[in-house]
């Protein structure tokens, strides 16, 4: 955390030995999310220390073929609760709307002090102490990189988008706090939405979902990337709109390991990491690179992970056909939205 502007607070010590009052929320549906979610939760149960026995709720918030019997068996074995919800959402086609629906659905059903959203492409390498909300802090997240649509300021090509986005909460872009990314950039208030923790009493999940829909209603985005990654922009703007006290997580609590950040495949960089955001590193082409990176600092993770091999989609022709049908329908709805907004995936006017 660098520029600690309005709403930011300083880091404090955590209480050792006590399980946090926290619920973990994930999404699960037929396909790749099945093995990814199971592997993520197993890493939590094995290596999560005080966090290992937290309640995990896997939400299915949109239409999907049935989960496999093996997935249901492993969910029961790992103590994962499954929640099906059927929201009436016109933006079900959005790649990440399911995450917002999931967090809002769980928020109204649990009583823990904190709720943590965890993407399924994450591994817990050791006890993730940084994820516990300190007193007086309402929201935790990290900014490992500027991503595709982050803005470094007025000269950044993405900045007009940030001006339009800030306007929806009655601000201008220069009102937003600055963050220092893990790869050394100073950017506007743009969090990674793969892992965040918030105080349940703030009702952040409900407000985040409402803001997400509003941003799509108002057609703030003018490119495919702006639509695709909009949840990460809305995440921070909802924090600002609600006036929440926030704190940036260190990179070690959400460290990215992926093909587009090749320099992170470095055992020395990963040694101190407690939460690994591996993105595409479980694919066959990067599998050995992932294992080699884990050896120096996390031999126990390497030993557990190596026999499992790369992640693959459960084999089922009917499920594959059904998923493809849903993908085509959602793709058509997405293209219709782009057309109404005046652009297509491959081309857009000035941002």
Protein language model annotation of sequence segments:
Residues 3-351:
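Glycosyltransferase catalytic domains, chiefly GT-A lineage
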């Amino acid at each position: 955390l660098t520029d600690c502007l309005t709403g930011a607070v300083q880091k404090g010590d955590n209480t050792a030995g006590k399980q946090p009052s926290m619920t973990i929320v994930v999404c699960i549906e037929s396909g790749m999310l099945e093995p990814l979610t199971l592997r993520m939760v197993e890493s939590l149960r094995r290596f999560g220390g005080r966090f290992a026995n937290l309640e995990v709720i896997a939400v299915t918030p949109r239409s999907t073929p049935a989960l496999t019997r093996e997935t249901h068996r492993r969910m029961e074995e790992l103590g994962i609760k499954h929640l099906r919800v059927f929201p009436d959402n016109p933006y079900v086609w959005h790649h990440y709307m399911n995450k917002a629906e999931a967090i809002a659905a769980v928020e109204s059903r649990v009583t823990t002090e904190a709720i943590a959203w965890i993407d399924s492409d994450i591994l817990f390498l050791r006890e993730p102490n940084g994820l516990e909300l300190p007193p007086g802090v309402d929201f935790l997240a990290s900014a490992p990189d500027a991503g595709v649509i982050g803005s470094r300021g007025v000269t950044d090509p993405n900045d007009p988008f940030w001006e339009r986005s800030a306007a929806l909460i009655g601000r201008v872009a220069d009102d937003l706090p600055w963050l220092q990314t893990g790869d050394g950039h100073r950017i506007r208030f743009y969090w990674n939405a793969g892992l965040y923790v918030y105080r349940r009493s703030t009702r952040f999940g409900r407000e985040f979902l409402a803001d997400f829909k509003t941003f799509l209603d108002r057609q703030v985005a003018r490119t495919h990337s702006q639509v695709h990654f909009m949840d990460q922009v809305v995440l921070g703007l909802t924090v600002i709109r609600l006036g929440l006290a926030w704190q940036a997580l260190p990179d070690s609590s959400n460290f990215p390991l992926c093909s587009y950040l090749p320099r992170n495949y470095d055992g020395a960089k990963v040694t101190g990491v407690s939460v690994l955001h591996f993105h595409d590193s479980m694919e066959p082409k990067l599998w050995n690179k992932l294992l080699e990176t884990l050896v120096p600092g996390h031999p126990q993770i390497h030993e557990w992970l190596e026999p499992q091999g790369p992640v693959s989609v459960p084999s089922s022709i009917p499920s594959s056909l059904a998923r493809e049908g849903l993908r085509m329908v959602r793709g058509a709805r997405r293209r219709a939205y782009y057309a109404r907004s005046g652009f297509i995936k491959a081309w857009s006017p000035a941002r």
